[in-house]
Amino acid sequence: MAAVILEDGAESYTTKGGIVVTRRRREASYSDAIAGYVDRLDERRGAVFSSNYEYPGRYTRWDTAVVDPPLAISSFGRSLWIEAYNERGEVLLALIAEDLKSVADITLGSLAARRLDLTINEPDRVFTEEERSKMPTVFTVLRAVTNLFHSEEDSNLGLYGAFGYDLAFQFDAIELKLSRPDDQRDMVLFLPDEILVVDHYAAKAWIDRYDFARENLSTEGKAADIAPEPFRSVDSIPPHGDHRPGEYAELVVKAKESFRRGDLFEVVPGQKFYERCESRPSEISNRLKAINPSPYSFFINLGNQEYLVGASPEMFVRVSGRRIETCPISGTIKRGDDPIADSEQILKLLNSKKDESELTMCSDVDRNDKSRVCVPGSVKVIGRRQIEMYSRLIHTVDHIEGRLRDDMDAFDGFLSHAWAVTVTGAPKLWAMRFIESHEKSPRAWYGGAIGMVGFNGDMNTGLTLRTIRIKDGIAEVRAGATLLYDSNPEEEEAETELKASAMIAAIRDAKSANSAKSARDVAAVGAGVSILLVDHEDSFVHTLANYFRQTGASVTTVRTPVAEEIFDRVKPDLVVLSPGPGTPKDFDCKATIKKARARDLPIFGVCLGLQALAEAYGGDLRQLAIPMHGKPSRIRVLEPGIVFSGLGKEVTVGRYHSIFADPSNLPREFVITAESEDGTIMGIEHSKEPVAAVQFHPESIMTLGGDAGMRMIENVVAHLAKRAKTKAA
C-alpha cells in the first residue's frame, strides 16, 4: 500500500503483515548530528554506521544512527530471544510474537511482557545444496520479522546490529572444539523507532520517528524511557594477547603442511591482542574514525557492557533489489611515507604473484557462493585487483555482482557467503575446521558482519574486520593473515600485528586531540632572504619558485635576459638558474652568470642551470643517447656538500633533459656531488665560489619521496644564500 500524507504532515503506510507504520520527519543539524549519537552510545544501546571512504561505483559517504531502540533480537546457538526495552518495545514484541505463532521450524518458549524465548528446530529432512540457505536457522525468524514489516515505502527502517562468526555453523555445521563463554551472543539486531540519516551529498540530516499499530495495539503515546547503563572501566591489566611472540609463525608452518597435503588452498587464522580501556568507547570510536577512514565504520553498544568499534574496509554482502554485490579483499602491503612511496608499494603489490593468487582464490570462492543463489550467467567480476588505500595499508580488491533468483532473498545471499573466504580460507569448510582447531579462542564477532537489513528487502553489511571488541572494560583486537603454501611465517605474523596496529593506536590515543599524522614542517630558513629566479621559458618555474617561497624567502621571477637594473632593484641574496628547453646558449646564460659573479652572488642551477654553469666555467656539454624526459632515476650521493646534506646515500629524483655536462672535461674547481647509475653528472658544487647545481628537478613529483626535493631547497637557502651565510657568521 502506497504511503499517504496525514494532516500533521506525517506519512503512513501499511506493511505486508498488516502493520500501519506512521513516519514523522524532522530536520537535524547536518554539521554535528552524528556526534551526539556517538556520545550517547557510551551508556545506551544502539549503533552508528558511517561510510567516510569513497570509491566510484562502490562506496559513497553516509551516516546512519539508532539509539535507545525499543526492541532487540539476540541469539546463541539455536536459542533466540526477543527483548523489549520500554513500553513501545512491548507493543512491537506483542506484534512479532503473534506473527511467529504461525512460523514452522521454531518452538516458542516463555512469553512475558518484555521477553520472548524460542528455539530453532533441527532440520527434519535432508536439504540439497541448492536449498541449504532455506534450512531452519535463526534467519528463519529474521525472515518472518522482515516479512511482517515488509514495505517498499521506506529504505531506512529495518534491523541494525551485528552478526557473529558462529552463525555460519547453522548453515554448515562443524565440530566445535573451542569452549564458548556462557554469555556469548551470536547475533544482536535492533529494531529502532527513531533513525538519524545524514546525506553528505545534499548536506542534510534528518530524524525519522516511527509509530506502529495493528488492530488494538499501538506504540502511539507509549513511554519511550530506557534506563542508561554507563560504561564501566577496570583497573586490571590484561595480557598482551593470546599468542606469544613467534607462535603465530609456528601456526603458519602447520598450515603449510595442510597446503602440501592438499587439505587447504589458503586459510586465514588470526591472533588476538588485549588493551585496557582507559577512554570511553565513544572516544575510541572518534579516534579510529579519524585515523582510519573506511567504507564501514561502526560503533555499536550491544548492552551488557559489550561494545564493537570498527573500521572495516570490506563489504560483506550488499543487496539492492535483486542485485547482490561483494568486494573481496586480499593482497596487503604497508603504506609508504608519502605518495611516491605509496606508488612504489602499489607496484610491488600488483607485481606480487602470491597476493594475486590470494585474491584469485577468494574471488573464485565468492563466485561459487553467488552461483548457489543467483540467476545462471549473472555472476560477473566487474572490478579486478583494484587498489584501495587506507590509513596504514594498501589492498587489492575485486568487485563481484550477481542477480538473485526469484526464489531467493537477501538472507539467502547472506548465508551463502557466510563467511567470506577472506576471513576463513578455501575450501571454506575445511578452512573453518582448521581455524576452530588452531586458533586460541572463539572468534565471537570477528569475521562475522555488521550492518543493516532493510524491511524493503535490501541489505548492506560489512565484514567485522579491523574491529575493537570491548567487553567489561577490556578491549580485544583480532587480526589475521591469508596464508598460502609460499607464505613466509615471520612476514605473516608481522602482517597480523600491522593490521591490529591502527586499532591499538586508537585505543591508546583516544584522548589525543590530533586526528592525523602531521606532515613534516618546512624549515623557515629563508626568512629575510631575497631570491632572483631566472626563467628560461620553463614549464616548471613556478613550482620551483613555490618551493623556495615555502622556506620563507622572497622570490622574484624574471625571464631572461636579465637587465642590470633588475639586479639593483631585487638585491638578491641568491640567483637561481631555472630549467628550460634547448641549450644554455639559447638564453645567453653566460651573460647572466657573469653579472651574478660580478656582484659576488651565490648561484644555484637546476637542470639547464647546471649545464649553463658547467659551460660558463669552461666545461663541455654532450647529448644523451636516450633523452630522460619525465623519467625517475635513482642517483648516488658522492659528496653531501650543501645540497644533499642530511639525505641518504641514494635518492630518487625526476629528470627532464637531453643535454648533460661532460664529466671528462668538467673544470677542476667543480666537485661532482651526485651521479646517476650510468655515471651522468647529477650534482656539482664549486670548491671556492658559492655555486652549486643539480641536473634533475627537485620540484618534480618524482623527487617527492622522503620530501627530498624540499629538503634540498632548504639546504640551498640555508647554506648557499648570501644573507644566510652572513647570519650564520
Swiss-Prot record:
Enzyme class: lyase
Entry GO MF terms: anthranilate synthase activity
Keyword Amino-acid biosynthesis: yes
Reaction(s) the record says it catalyses: chorismate + L-glutamine = anthranilate + pyruvate + L-glutamate + H(+)
Pfam entry (one): Anth_synt_I_N
EC number: 4.1.3.27
Chain segments annotated as coiled-coil in the UniProt record: none
Keywords (A to Z) from UniProt: Amino-acid biosynthesis, Aromatic amino acid biosynthesis, Glutamine amidotransferase, Lyase, Tryptophan biosynthesis
Record protein name field: Anthranilate synthase
Organism of origin: Rhizobium meliloti (strain 1021) (Ensifer meliloti)
